[in-house]
């Protein structure tokens, strides 16, 4: 996007082309409208079929981290405390939290914190529910000049993705774990249909 000719971007993105190209360079001059009344932002799901595979559990944590990060950015907020909630098949519910050195609105950082919290939970049975929450909220204080190279790229990528999804919809550009989740749901649906299908005599 940074190297693309503006005319070509405009033909695809329309009026949003200038904004999206500026965001790709880390320039965001939109007004900050943070709500101080919001104390926490979270997302959770209850699963029809208990999750037992570590890869499936981690993918759900990634998805919820992504949803939370998007909501934080939408409200121009960053969360310093990250919490992971896990409910097992036995309805045993465990919540763990940790505080970061600085607030974040990035999926990658929220996900990393949630995975660290998962290590503190005894995962000895199927998982019925997973939730990720960010609290201790405040407007982001960082400036792009202070970011590490990796974090700067993550910030720019998140801004570009937000702008594209805002214009073209959530499915216009998605991270890989969302696509993997869609495949998992399709497989579950097929298994359900096969079980419900009448047996041939």
Predicted regions span which residues?
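DNA-contacting surface of Y-family translesion DNA polymerases
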Residues: 2-126
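Acidic, metal-coordinating catalytic segment for phosphate/diphosphate chemistry
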Residues: 102-201
